[in-house]
Amino acid sequence: YPKHIIPHIITSLKNKGEVELLENSKKNKRSFLHNIDSCRAILALLGSIEALDGSVYNVATDEEISIVELVELIASKLGIKEPAILFSGYRASDPERRILNTEKIRQRARWEPIVKLSQGLDMCLGKECKE
């Protein structure tokens, strides 16, 4: 199972028109953060006296999506109407949700993510450069 799911999905759809996923992917929910927002979070923390106390901060978005929904979203952006999704294997240790609580960074550093998943995928796929 790939460590980096978005590049795996894009490459599989472009090369084969299908994606192989674990059975868990039918239910698993994830949130994805764009690098722009990661960098903005670091800058917000460095610029906040209140945040410079040695604390650990979760940096994430509240936007949840299942892996299957992610495949469908990426496929639609690639012009693939009905992507073939093949399910095989199961990872028992794979949590159903990987969603972080970001209340502390939002309050102390006044940080909010600004890049939505769909927009980040457009950037990744080069759509914004064409428009």
What is each PLM-predicted segment?
Residues 1-6, 29:
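Flexible, glycine-rich beta-alpha linker
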